[in-house]
Amino acid sequence: MREIVHLQTGQCGNQIGAAFWQTISGEHGLDSNGVYNGTSELQLERMSVYFNERSGNKYVPRAVLVDLEPGTMDAVRAGPFGQLFRPDNFVFGQSGAGNNWAKGHYTEGAELVDQVLDVVRREAEGCDCLQGFQITHSLGGGTGAGMGTLLISKIREEFPDRMMATFSVVPSPKVSDTVVEPYNATLSVHQLVENSDETFCIDNEALYDICMRTLKLSNPSYGDLNYLVSAVMSGVTTCLRFPGQLNSDLRKLAVNMVPFPRLHFFMVGFAPLTSRGAHSFRAVSVPELTQQMFDPKNMMAASDFRNGRYLTCSAIFRGRVAMKEVEDQMRNVQNKNSSYFVEWIPNNIQTALCAIPPRGLTMSSTFIGNSTSIQELFKRVGEQFTAMFRRKAFLHWYTGEGMDEMEFTEAESNMNDLVSEYQQYQDAGIDEEEEEYEEELPEGEE
C-alpha cells in the first residue's frame, strides 16, 4: 500500500495534526485508543496509508510529533486521542524556539533534527511502499517554520524521489500573534518554494471569517479553526485513504495541479460548511456543493480568486454522488466563470469521487485550487517584511543565532520572484505565448 508518513512540528502543527488524526480516526472507525470497531470493509481497505497495524486489532498512526518545548506535546498526550500515538514518536526539546526562525532552523532545531530523522526513518522502514510525507506547521513561528523547513530539506535529501506535501498556516493580515511573523514567513516560503511539492495554504483570518460569517460563531476558538482545517485535510487525503476512481495519491495530485514547479501553493475550500455541533439539518445537493465550494468566502486563504485566475483546480466529491451530475456541474462552473481560468490550460478542472462521506454528512466536497491570486498573500507578507527589514528591526535576534543579512535579502527576492511569476502567468494569453516563443528561437544559447 502507498503509505504516507505524517509530521507535525511546533504548536500550531501539533494542534492541527491532533485535530486531523481525530477526524480520520473517526472516519476509519477507530476509537481513541486506536482499536477498530467500525462497520464497513471500506474503512479497513486502505487503512495502512496512515496507520500501522499492531496486535489485537489496534492501529497506530504513522505520525511523528516534533516540538522544541514540551508544552503542546503534553497537551496532545493528555487530549482525547493522546493514547493513539506511539510514545517514542514524540520528539521534543526543552528550550523552545521563541518564535525565532533562526533558532528553529539553525541552533535549537538543528540539535534535535537527527533524533527526528531517526524516528522518520523508522516509520519509513515500516512502510511497504512509501509514497511521501505530509507536514503540518505554521509559517509565522519558530519551530513550525524554522525547524519544519529544516526537516523538509533534510527529508528531501534522504528521500529525494518521494512526495512532500505541506499544510502550512500562513500569517494573516489582521490576526497576528508575533511581530516577527513576516520575517519567519518569508524565510519559510524561501524554503518551501524549493523543497516542497505541494503546499496547501491555510490562513487564520480566512478561518475566522468562515467561523463568524458562515458558521455564525460569535467568538471562535482555535478548536473551531482546527476543526475546519481537519475537514479540509481529511478531504484532500480522501482519495488516498478510501478506494476511489480518481486521483488516488499525492503524486497524481501534484501532476494534475502544478504546471510550473515553483507554483505549487494551493488554496483550499470545503463544503458544506457546518459548525461543529450542528451537522447539516438539510439535504445537500451537488449544485449546492459546487456553488458553495467555488464561493470566495469559502476559501481558507485570505486571497480572493476573483483578483487572479486559476491555473488548475481539483474538486473531490464524497458521498453517494452521481458522476454525471458532478461532471455537468463542473462544466457549468467553468463555462460561467471562464474569465477566472487561464485559457492556455484546457480542461484544467479535474474531479475525484469517493463513495464514503465524512462522519455526520451525506455528501461533501473539497476544493483545491492553484490560483494566481495566491500572490496577494505573498505580497502582503512581503510588504510587512520590507517595512521591518528596511529599518533592520528585530534583526539582532536572527543574526545572534548566526544568520546573515544576506539570507534575508535572498529570501525577500525569492518571494518577489514568486509573486512576479504568478503575475506573468496571470497575464499570459494564448496568442502572446506563441509570439514570445518565436522571438526566443533564434538565440538558442540557453
Swiss-Prot record:
Name of the protein in question: Tubulin beta chain
Function statement: Tubulin is the major constituent of microtubules, a cylinder consisting of laterally associated linear protofilaments composed of alpha- and beta-tubulin heterodimers. Microtubules grow by the addition of GTP-tubulin dimers to the microtubule end, where a stabilizing cap forms. Below the cap, tubulin dimers are in GDP-bound state, owing to GTPase activity of alpha-tubulin.
One Gene Ontology molecular-function label: GTP binding
Ligand binding (GTP): 11, 69, 138, 142-144, 204, 226
Cofactor: Mg(2+)
Cellular compartments per GO CC: cytoplasm; microtubule
Subunit structure, as described in the record: Dimer of alpha and beta chains. A typical microtubule is a hollow water-filled tube with an outer diameter of 25 nm and an inner diameter of 15 nM. Alpha-beta heterodimers associate head-to-tail to form protofilaments running lengthwise along the microtubule wall with the beta-tubulin subunit facing the microtubule plus end conferring a structural polarity. Microtubules usually have 13 protofilaments but different protofilament numbers can be found in some organisms and specialized cells.
Pfam family, one: Tubulin_C
Alphabetized PANTHER family for the sequence: TUBULIN
InterPro entries hit by this protein: Beta-tubulin_BS, Beta_tubulin, Tub_FtsZ_C, Tubulin, Tubulin/FtsZ-like_C, Tubulin/FtsZ_2-layer-sand-dom, Tubulin/FtsZ_GTPase_sf, Tubulin_C
Gene Ontology biological process terms in this record: microtubule-based process; response to antibiotic
Family statement: Belongs to the tubulin family.
Region (Disordered): 421-446
Chain residues that bind Mg(2+): 69
Alphabetic keyword roster: Antibiotic resistance, Cytoplasm, Cytoskeleton, GTP-binding, Magnesium, Metal-binding, Microtubule, Nucleotide-binding
Gene name per UniProt: TUB2
Subcellular location: Cytoplasm, Cytoskeleton
Acidic residues bias (residue ranges): 429-446
Species the sequence originates in: Fusarium fujikuroi
